[in-house]
């Protein structure tokens, strides 16, 4: 059960580390051993600090994520909410996106909210105690994920074809693209798409989706935003014809039903977000950025 993972003490220590880091210029942090124990996945000053945890399947006890990789544990990446000043968290928003994504048929690892504030997702690089070989699109190709020249969905689809992944996974990638457009996940860069190598079959496959969420601050009004990955040479004002062009190029015959299914879950996302306790003003702000493909 989700209550079996207790992160309160870790969060308090992390807050202390963040405070010390904020006051430190050149002095070496004396919390280095702590950070190593909990395997903080981003810098402690990052906007969304992460830790790796392993939860015992038998009694719910937890250990740091680098201690036990056995099949007796569930292995999680946890995005911690350390901001007590807001009446919602970005982690709650990401969980609402997770619920909508999976309802739309997108393949993701099982995820949950811990104490209604921390987002925990099972790791796909550890399955039944086995380490899996994962590379991002950026890591496979050397493409700089910040460079617009390489950042396109067409490049991502072409890479998938080069890796000879099954056509069903090409269709899955298309579904993710449509979801990201409709639900305004603009931060869908090349590091947010990965591939898994299966050594037994000597083949590559598409990894489960991850980092699908609303990436902007819903409390701010943005006049114009652009996508990390272009579609049909466009980063803004993506329309139905742009999606059709991708569908034709990569033989996605069911594109119309995919679009319909994704768009039909906008109401579900709003209901889920409300049930999670996300304020209506935040739900309305995010929803205004959604794109209805016509």
Give the positions of each predicted feature.
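Phosphate/dinucleotide-binding and metal-coordinating scaffold of catalytic cores
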Residues: 1-190, 194-294
């Amino acid at each position: 059960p989700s209550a079996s993972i207790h992160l309160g003490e870790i969060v308090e220590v992390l807050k202390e580390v963040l405070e010390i880091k904020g006051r430190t210029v050149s002095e070496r942090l004396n919390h280095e051993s702590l950070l190593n124990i909990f395997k903080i996945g981003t810098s402690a000053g990052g906007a969304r600090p992460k830790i790796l945890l392993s939860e015992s399947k038998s009694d719910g006890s937890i250990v740091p994520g680098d201690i036990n990789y056995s099949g007796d544990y569930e292995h999680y990446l946890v995005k911690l909410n350390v901001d007590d000043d807001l009446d919602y968290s970005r982690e709650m928003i990401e969980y609402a996106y997770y619920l909508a994504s999976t309802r739309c048929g997108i393949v993701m690892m099982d995820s949950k909210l811990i104490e209604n504030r921390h987002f925990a997702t099972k790791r796909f690089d550890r399955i039944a105690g086995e380490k899996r070989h994962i590379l991002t699109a950026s890591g496979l190709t050397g493409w700089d994920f910040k460079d617009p020249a390489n950042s396109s969905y067409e490049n991502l689809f072409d890479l998938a074809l080069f890796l000879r992944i099954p056509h069903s996974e090409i269709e899955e990638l298309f579904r993710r693209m449509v979801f990201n457009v409709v639900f305004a996940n603009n931060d869908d860069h090349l590091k947010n798409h990965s591939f898994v190598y299966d050594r037994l079959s000597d083949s590559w496959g598409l990894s489960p989706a991850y980092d699908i969420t609303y990436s902007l601050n819903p409390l701010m009004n943005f006049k114009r935003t652009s996508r990390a990955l272009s579609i049909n040479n466009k980063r803004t004002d993506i329309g139905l014809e742009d999606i059709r062009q991708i569908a034709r190029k990569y033989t996605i015959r069911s594109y119309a039903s995919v679009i319909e299914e994704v768009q039909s879950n906008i109401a579900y996302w709003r209901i889920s977000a409300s049930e999670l306790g996300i304020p209506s003003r935040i739900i309305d702000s995010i929803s205004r950025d959604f794109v209805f493909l016509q």
